């Protein structure tokens, strides 16, 4: 049927009605957006963007902070790490332009509120709140109310008087140990420094203000004031004020009460046993070269304190006595200990550890066995734990627990090694500053300018003595002196037997005469002459290498040859 004028007019009218129904929601949304722009922007700028008619509109009204449907939201790989993650976006500057509310009160805003309060005119529109009762407007009202609370607390703090610091009366006499020093002619009074109170002048409130820190404004129930270090300095720890200046006042009052008590004079007392333990440093003899003075400018030699350090280590030797513990160890034998030390030397070579680590580990084992009884199944575990502790003490990069479990061939697990480590530290009372013979030997050889092959031979003698149970009770400093004396005699050759080996230089720096450690020399020499077993050749093979100058192949001397021309064996009752 062909269209007529009537049917055409009816179709046009129906199309107009449908178009009107589709346009009306769009015009309504456009009007709402225009009114919203007036309340937020026009109130501040006084004009309207002429292109507001071209704004992108939505067919359905959404929440204020909901994103546009067709836009893509970018998020950081780590996400938002704040408390208000749901209302944070990636463009905070644009959010502030659009919202204009929820900002922290600045110094100018606080000053404006203070002036308005003084003039009883609180109608200052600081934050530009809208008339509509929305979440944003309620947020503005809460912010204004919080600012008023801050001002009230500041005024309360300004009204308090500032306490005057008390001066501590100077002591007339100072006692150091048992020596009484004369009093100073004009003793200087030292005032007690109390934490400063918040007695600030009114014009300075804008410059020194409490900072209001808001973590989540929607869930905020009470204020939190964090005083900076420049505003409130505490002598012990930082003071945190949670919206209450009364806490600061109470702390200041308590500190003031403590200082008002009768002060006691300063007494510096030393332990009664300290004077007997201090070893005086004798003057350097004329025939002895002052090694420390010669190396005074070398910071690595520590020449200023070297003599004091080694005298202190000699005093500490008495704090680590090792008695004959094998009768108490009913499950162990001296041969088991020898096998353990030989295995520890192999571990030191495998991991390329320092020699000090090996000596400290053996000391820890002996100290533990002096105080605790164990069975033979735990002996290797004790050696591994002692080595693990020594590595942590001396090594830059200690091996891992898995390395020690591997070197033990899977005999123990991770928990057993850690448990033994804790137990060992508890038994030795966590004291790892044990004087070691290796450190004494290095000091003595350096002062006497001993050549490296001779020093290596002395180290071989010392390391071989670690396996001998008969040497556990000897002094480490005397062990180092005996090993150095033997190395000097053995490397001197047959033509140097009548030469005086223990010179005045060694006597001065070691502090020992030859007769003081002659008994140790015979014990060490007996260990060198003992026929080695096939199962304990680690140390001999180690020092037979060219790196160690093959000192294990040096010919041995008898006791008589060792002391020839230096000490009379008949007078010393030595054979």
Swiss-Prot record:
Main subcellular location: nucleus
Subunit text: Interacts with Cdk1 kinase.
Top-rank taxon, per record: Eukaryota
Comment, domains: The N-terminal destruction box (D-box) probably acts as a recognition signal for degradation via the ubiquitin-proteasome pathway.
Keyword Phosphoprotein set for record: yes
Record Pfam families: Cyclin_C, Cyclin_N
Biological function: Cyclins are positive regulatory subunits of the cyclin-dependent kinases (CDKs), and thereby play an essential role in the control of the cell cycle, notably via their destruction during cell division. Probably functions redundantly with other cyclins in regulation of cell cycle. Its presence may be required to delay a deadline for completing cytokinesis that is ordinary imposed by nuclear envelope reformation. Degradation of CycB and CycB3 promote cytokinesis furrow initiation and ingression. Required with CycB for female fertility.
Protein family per UniProt: Belongs to the cyclin family. Cyclin AB subfamily.
Motif (D-box): 75-83
The species this protein was found in: Drosophila melanogaster (Fruit fly)
Subcellular location per the Swiss-Prot or TrEMBL entry: Nucleus
SMART domains per record: CYCLIN (SM00385), Cyclin_C (SM01332)
CDD domains, A to Z: CYCLIN_CCNB3_rpt1, CYCLIN_CCNB3_rpt2
Transport among keywords: no
Protein name: G2/mitotic-specific cyclin-B3
GO cellular component: cyclin-dependent protein kinase holoenzyme complex; cytoplasm; nucleus
Tissue: In embryo, it is expressed in all mitotically proliferating cells, with a high level in neuroblasts. Not expressed in old embryos and thereafter. Not expressed in endoreplicating tissues.
Alphabetical list of InterPro entries matching this protein: Cyclin, Cyclin-like_dom, Cyclin-like_sf, Cyclin_A/B-like, Cyclin_C-dom, Cyclin_N
